[in-house]
Structure formats: structure tokens, C-alpha cells
């Protein structure tokens, strides 16, 4: 039994090559069936994200799997091979556990990868490319990722601006589910902020953008309300949290607009997070009572502190993946021992059946009973001791005392 992990990721390849080896959702079902057909066990899972494409197989040949990947995407070996990494046995299991735990991610400890690995596993089950070993490998991996999350602080500290902004909001408001949020801008950073807010239970979001169409497109995913920048004064008084990130050269929110909104809110506190450069919110807003303004510099200082915290947590997480991958391989070896015992017994029974049938035929033809039994015993003995005798001979000729000692123990030659 041989577990193999072959992949390419953000550390080894450019985005251009990663795009070429990626598998689209509508094709991954058939791709996994095709890959599984190249393994002896029919087991394969493909994990394909923007940052990585990885193939996990049981009883597959490394060179054959790489050839399949290149053929599937129509790529030249010399273009792909230098960017590939591969792991076998326990190293393959540990790599999967590290990936699912966020230890191999671009942002250390990011939680999204676990969901992506789970989704890949579900698709593999739907494709019928999962059997006992791969199933157990992935189920154990999900348990390990959960263990890493609960027993370390790997995911507790924010290490991206978007995540840090939402984490700050969580510290100030006891529950985000009842807060009203105004997002200004509709770019990638604000979209990521919206995702983190949704994951934390925020149900009421308004997205303000210069072009309404872009805001509407983003709002569909998050069930939010889209408005233009000109409508901000009407919605600002309702906002408990304001997070802004636009490319505007001039501030979007001035001190006067925020002051007016706070009066309408009867001086309920408002958190404002400005993650734009240049700034979207006038710095004088921080002088207002009940307005709590944080800039991207404030967030970066938090992020740097948290990176150090995550590195400490990562060291603990690495120990967990090492221990758990070792335990998994012990289970795999127990399966192999059961298979070996079954195969050895089956082989011995086949020899016995063959020789007994030959002896019965001779008896039926009038052969001497004593002679037939002696011949049966001799033939059976010779056949059964043939392989052990060969192994002992080879070990003796090579002076391999370790193997010789193990063989003597297995064959019971050292018993008194």
C-alpha cells in the first residue's frame, strides 16, 4: 500500500502555471475518475484552489500520476516538473494534515482551506474514487484540523487587513449578528471583509460604491443592499460599523457628516475602520465623542503582533500533525499485516489443496497408501519451506545478520 501526494502551489509556481494545472468544478468529477483509473486501488482525490493543485492517490505510481497530470492539461514535462513536489507514505498524510490545518497556506492558519479540502473529498466520494484507506486518511485529517483549531491559537489572530478589521469589530461589539454594517467600496478587500462579516453572523450590510452596478453584483452574494456614494448620508446614521476601502484620492467621509450621523444616533457609538490609502475618512473624525476611528496603520500593528503569535501556535500544530500522521500509518500497517496474513494462509491452503488432490488421484488409481502419504508429506514440506529456505540462503550469503536473526525468530528456530 503506497500513499502518494503530488502537487504544485503558490510557493513553487507562478499564478500563470497554477492556472494551467487547475481543475474547473465542472470537470473535476471526470478528472478524478480518470486519475483513479491510473491507480491499483482506484482511489484518488484532487484538491484544486487558486493557490494549489494537489493529487492524493493510494497505490499509484508517482511517474504515472505526473504523466497523467501533464497529459490531462496538455503541458510539457519540462515546464511542470521543476514546480512539482511529492510525498509518500507518512509524509503524504502529514502534508494533507498540514494543508487542511492552514500550515501550508499563503496566510498562515487561514480557515478557508479546510472547507476547500472537505469539498474536494465530497466530490471524490460522488465520483466513486474513495475507498477505505483514502476515506480514513481524509476523515482523520478533518479531525486533526479541528484539533489544531481547538488546541492552538493558529486561527485566533488576524493576519490580513480584512480579517483584522472584522476581528477589531468583534472585540468592540459583543455580538456582530445584531449590528448594522456600512461598507464603502466594492473591491477585493471589501469583498473579503463582507465574507468575514457574513461568516461571523452579520445579517444587515449596505455596500456603497461609486458605480451602483459593481455594488449590486457584490451584494447578490451577501444578501446586502447596494447604494451609491451620494446616498451615504442617508444610511450612515443607521450604521454601527463603517469599513471603507476605495481608490478615491479625497476623503469620502468628513468630520461634519459623521458628527451629524452621531447626533441622529443619539450618540450611540460608531466604529469606523479606514483601510484605504490614501485615507477615505478624515482623521479629525477621531476627535468626535462616540466615534472610534482606526486606520490601516493601526491594523498593521495588530497584524504584526499576531503573526508572531501564529508562528508559536504553528509550532504546536506541527507537533500535532506529526503525531497524528504517525498514528494513521500505524493503522495502515495493521491493515497490511492483516492482508499479509490472509495472503500467506491462502497461499498455503492452495498448495495443500493442490497436493492433496494429486494424492487422492493416485490413491484412486490404486497407488500404495503409505507411499502416497509419504510423498504427500515430502512434497508439502518442500513447497512450504521453499521461500523461507531461499530467504535464509540469501541472508547468509550476504552476511546480513539482522535479517538472518529476524528470519530465525519468525521461523521459531530460536525457541528452546
From Swiss-Prot:
NADP(+) binds at residues 185-190. It catalyses: (S)-4-amino-5-oxopentanoate + tRNA(Glu) + NADP(+) = L-glutamyl-tRNA(Glu) + NADPH + H(+). Keywords: NADP, Oxidoreductase, Porphyrin biosynthesis. It is an enzyme of class 1 (oxidoreductase). The keyword Transmembrane does not apply. Substrate binds at residues 49-52, 105, 110-112, 116. GO terms for molecular function: glutamyl-tRNA reductase activity; NADP binding. Its EC number is 1.2.1.70. It holds the Pfam family Shikimate_DH. Gene3D superfamilies: Glutamyl-tRNA reductase, N-terminal domain (3.30.460.30), NAD(P)-binding Rossmann-like Domain (3.40.50.720). Homodimer. NCBIfam families: hemA (TIGR01035). HAMAP family: Glu_tRNA_reductase. Belongs to the glutamyl-tRNA reductase family. Catalyzes the NADPH-dependent reduction of glutamyl-tRNA(Glu) to glutamate 1-semialdehyde (GSA). During catalysis, the active site Cys acts as a nucleophile attacking the alpha-carbonyl group of tRNA-bound glutamate with the formation of a thioester intermediate between enzyme and glutamate, and the concomitant release of tRNA(Glu). The thioester intermediate is finally reduced by direct hydride transfer from NADPH, to form the product GSA. This is Glutamyl-tRNA reductase. It comes from Shewanella sp. (strain MR-4).
Amino acid at each position: 500500500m503506497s500513499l502518494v501526494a503530488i502537487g504544485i502551489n503558490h510557493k513553487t509556481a507562478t499564478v500563470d502555471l497554477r492556472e494551467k494545472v487547475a481543475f474547473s468544478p465542472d470537470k473535476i468529477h471526470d478528472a478524478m475518475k480518470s486519475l483513479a483509473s491510473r491507480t491499483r486501488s482506484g482511489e484518488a482525490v484532487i484538491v484544486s484552489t487558486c493557490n494549489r493543485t494537489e493529487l492524493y492517490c493510494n497505490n499509484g505510481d508517482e511517474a504515472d500520476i505526473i504523466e497523467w497530470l501533464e497529459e490531462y492539461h496538455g503541458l510539457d514535462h519540462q515546464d511542470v516538473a521543476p514546480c512539482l513536489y511529492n510525498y509518500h507514505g507518512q509524509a503524504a498524510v502529514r502534508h494533507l494534515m498540514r494543508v487542511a490545518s492552514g500550515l501550508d497556506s499563503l496566510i498562515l492558519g487561514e480557515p478557508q482551506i479546510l472547507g476547500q479540502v472537505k469539498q474536494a473529498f465530497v466530490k471524490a466520494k460522488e465520483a466513486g474514487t474513495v475507498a477505505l484507506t483514502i476515506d480514513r486518511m481524509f476523515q482523520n485529517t478533518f479531525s486533526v484540523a479541528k484539533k489544531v483549531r481547538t488546541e492552538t491559537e493558529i486561527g485566533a489572530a488576524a493576519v490580513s487587513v480584512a480579517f483584522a478589521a472584522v476581528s477589531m469589530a468583534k472585540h468592540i461589539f459583543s455580538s456582530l449578528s445584531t449590528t448594522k454594517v456600512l461598507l464603502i467600496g466594492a473591491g477585493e478587500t471589501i469583498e473579503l471583509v463582507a465574507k468575514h462579516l457574513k461568516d461571523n453572523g452579520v445579517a444587515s450590510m449596505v455596500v456603497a460604491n461609486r458605480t451602483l452596478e459593481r455594488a449590486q453584483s457584490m451584494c447578490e452574494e451577501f444578501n446586502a443592499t447596494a447604494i451609491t456614494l451620494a446616498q451615504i448620508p442617508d444610511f450612515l446614521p443607521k450604521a454601527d460599523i463603517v469599513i471603507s476601502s476605495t481608490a478615491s484620492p479625497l476623503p469620502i467621509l468628513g468630520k461634519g457628516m459623521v458628527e451629524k450621523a452621531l447626533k441622529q444616533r443619539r450618540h450611540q457609538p460608531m466604529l469606523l475602520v479606514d483601510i484605504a490609502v490614501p485615507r477615505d475618512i478624515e482623521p479629525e473624525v477621531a476627535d468626535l465623542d462616540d466615534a472610534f476611528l482606526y486606520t490601516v496603520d493601526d491594523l498593521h500593528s495588530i497584524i504584526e503582533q499576531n503573526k508572531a503569535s501564529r508562528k508559536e501556535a504553528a509550532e504546536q500544530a506541527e507537533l500535532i500533525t506529526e503525531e497524528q500522521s504517525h498514528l494513521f500509518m500505524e493503522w495502515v500497517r495493521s491493515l497490511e499485516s492483516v492482508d499479509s496474513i490472509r495472503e500467506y494462509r491462502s497461499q498455503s491452503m492452495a498448495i495443500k489443496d493442490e497436493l492433496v488432490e494429486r494424492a487422492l488421484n493416485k490413491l484412486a488409481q490404486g497407488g500404495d497408501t503409505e507411499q502416497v502419504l509419504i510423498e504427500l508429506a515430502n512434497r508439502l514440506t518442500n513447497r512450504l519451506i521453499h521461500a523461507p529456505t531461499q530467504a535464509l540462503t540469501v541472508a547468509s550469503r550476504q552476511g546480513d545478520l539482522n535479517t538472518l536473526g529476524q528470519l530465525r525468530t519468525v521461523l521459531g528456530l530460536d525457541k528452546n
